[in-house]
C-alpha cells in the first residue's frame, strides 16, 4: 500500500511558551481534561516503549491510572515482556496521542515499582473479573494451547476466588511509575511547522527548563 499522496493539514490549535506553567504536569492534566471533554476514547492510553538487555525495543499500549507530581503510573504483570525489560533497563518512554485534537505528549524517564500498599489499593478497585483475569497470565505473553484452555483456567480461578470474596493481589502484578526527566508537548500546525515545547531536567530534584524544538 502506498500512502505517499495522503495529507492532513493540522490547524486545530497552537502552543505558546507564555501559556505554559512552570512544571509540565499541570499542562498534562489540562490536556487530558480537554481530551476527556471532547470524548476522546481512552485518552489516558499510552504507547509504552521499553528496551531490555538484548537492545531490542518493544512498544505496546497500556493505560495510565494516575498522573503524579513525578510522572505517570500504570499497572501490569511484573513477569511480562515489559516487566523483564524494565528490570534490565529502567529507562523508558511513553506517548499520549490524541489524533482528533492533533496533539501528542512524550514522557521520558526512569521507571520504578510503586509501593505495595498502592498496588493493593488499586487492585481492589478493579472489577471482579479483571482481578481474576490478572491471575490467568502466569506469565503474561506466555504460550497457551488454545483459547479454550485459557477460558478453562479462568473458570477454575473463578471457582478458587468466588465473587464476593476478596481476590488476593498476585505477587507478580503491580504498579510502575515513570519518573519523568523529559516531557514534550506537540501541537500540530499548518505546513508541518508544528509546535514542540520540551520540559527537561537532569533529575527529579532539579527545576524544569522549557525549550522550543524545531519540527
Swiss-Prot record:
Per the record, a Pfam family? PNPOx_N
For the protein in the UniProt heading, the enzyme class is oxidoreductase
- What note does UniProt attach to the cofactor annotation? Binds 1 FMN per subunit.
Tell me the residue numbers annotated for binding FMN. 60-65, 75-76, 82, 104, 140-141, 186, 196
Q: Which cysteines are joined by disulfide bonds?
A: none
Cite the GO molecular-function annotations of the record: FMN binding; pyridoxamine phosphate oxidase activity
Swiss-Prot/TrEMBL cofactor(s): FMN
Which EC numbers does the record give?
Answer: 1.4.3.5
Per its record, the protein catalyses: pyridoxamine 5'-phosphate + O2 + H2O = pyridoxal 5'-phosphate + H2O2 + NH4(+); pyridoxine 5'-phosphate + O2 = pyridoxal 5'-phosphate + H2O2
InterPro entries named in the record: Pyridox_Oxase, Pyridox_Oxase_CS, Pyridox_Oxase_N, Pyridoxamine_oxidase_dimer_C, Split_barrel_FMN-bd
- Give the record's keywords alphabetically: Flavoprotein, FMN, Oxidoreductase, Pyridoxine biosynthesis
Q: In which pathway does it act?
A: Cofactor metabolism; pyridoxal 5'-phosphate salvage; pyridoxal 5'-phosphate from pyridoxamine 5'-phosphate: step 1/1; Cofactor metabolism; pyridoxal 5'-phosphate salvage; pyridoxal 5'-phosphate from pyridoxine 5'-phosphate: step 1/1
Superkingdom of the organism of origin: Bacteria
For the ligand (substrate), the binding residues are 7-10, 65, 122, 126, 130, 192-194
Q: Does the keyword Flavoprotein apply?
A: yes
Mention one GO biological process in which this protein takes part, according to its record.
pyridoxine biosynthetic process
The role this protein plays is: Catalyzes the oxidation of either pyridoxine 5'-phosphate (PNP) or pyridoxamine 5'-phosphate (PMP) into pyridoxal 5'-phosphate (PLP).
Sequence similarity: Belongs to the pyridoxamine 5'-phosphate oxidase family.
How does this chain assemble?
Answer: Homodimer.
Question: What name does the UniProt record give this protein?
Answer: Pyridoxine/pyridoxamine 5'-phosphate oxidase
**Encoding gene (name):** pdxH
